[in-house]
Every structure is written in C-alpha cells, then in structure tokens.
Amino acid sequence: MTGTEKTPAATPEFRLAYVPGATPAKWVRIWNERQPDVRLTLVPVEAAEVADVLRRGDADAGLVRLPVDRTYFSAISLYTETTVVVVPKDHVVAAVEEVTLADLADEIVQHPLDDVLEWESLPGQAAFERPARTADAVELVAAGVGLLVVPQSLARLHHRRDLTYRTVTDAPESSVALAWPEERTTDQVEDFIGIVRGRTVNSSR
C-alpha cells in the first residue's frame, strides 16, 4: 500500500434484533428503499434474551415483546396479537371459531419455559413436565399430549399440517414493540422509528 491509498471505510450498519413471531420484513423493505447505503442486519434472538442483547450493544434496536424495563429502554408499541389455542385438527375445539379459558379447564395445557404470555393463573390442567421451548410444546400437541396457548404469530411460526388453532377470547395478549436503549438513540434508530410510525421520506422527526 502506498502512502496515498486509504483503507476503505466500513459499510454503515443498523442491527435489528427480533423475537420469534415478530415480522420485520415490511419495515426492512422500506429501510432498504430509503437507506440503500446503510445495511440492515437482522439478529434473531429468543424473547427472554433480547433485553440483554440490546444492553450489550449487540443490536441497535429490537422488535420485542412487552413489557420491557422502561427505566433503561424506550419503546413504541406496534401491535397487540390475538391469543390462540393450538390443537390437533380432529380435536373438539377445532369445530368452533373461538373458545374461552373455561372451555380448556379440563384439558392438559402445555406451558413451555419460554412462554411469552403473562398469566395470573395457568389455564387447564398442568402437564407432567414443562417443555423447554414452544417448538417442543407444539410437538407434544401433535403427539396428542395436551394443547398449547400462544400468540397467533407463534402458532403460525410453528405451523403443522396436522394442527390448527382457534382464538381464545379471554386469554392474556402479547404486544410487540420497537425498543432500544434510551441513551443510544442514534440517527439510525430515529430513522427506523420513522419507518415503523409510517412517516414519509419528507416527514420531519
């Protein structure tokens, strides 16, 4: 290298963490249209780990499930999900459009360790052992061992042809939000906030 040559500058990057079930594709597409010179990198992370990922600076912002620590994070609620019960297609619940928690009282209901719903009291009858992950719970439901209550996006994420789901009208709901460390509100974070809030290119912050 001669004295006149310069080291190429690193490509600017915005890292967006997202939890299972969150769907960043629409906002990523808009980002790529508006910020072609800033690479958006998606960082998949479990719901229980996303706060630590953001605290460590391994991502600039994240699509998370509420609640978050509002003393450290800023957050913008994006949407609240319908809660559903996942059942085998031949289960009696599959014959109706929606159910209540009382309808599940006599059923075994799987409660995985990574459950993202906040329960005052768990529905149904407890399984002998809690599965570690939602994916494991879905496998158990498919094997005829109980039912599973989850946000609709997770039911879709773990879709199987032999399973279906129905709305649970009185179950806790899960809200998805954009969150980031308040002390690290960068210009790129502000730009992404504008995208999720539907601002146009010419809108002010």
Where is each model-derived feature located?
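Short alpha-helix C-terminal cap/hinge motif
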Residues: 2-16, 20-44, 52
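Short helix-loop hinge/linker segments at domain boundaries
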Residues: 1-17, 71-75, 94-95, 158, ...
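Short beta-strand-centered segments that line the small-molecule binding cleft or hinge
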Residues: 2-4, 27-30, 34, 48-83, ...
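Hydrophobic/proline-rich hinge and linker segments of small-molecule sensing/allosteric domains
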Residues: 74-113, 173-183
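A late-sequence structural motif
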Residues: 26, 166-204
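Beta-alpha-beta core module
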Residues: 69-76, 81, 139-184
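Hydrophobic hinge/microswitch elements
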Residues: 46-58, 112-164
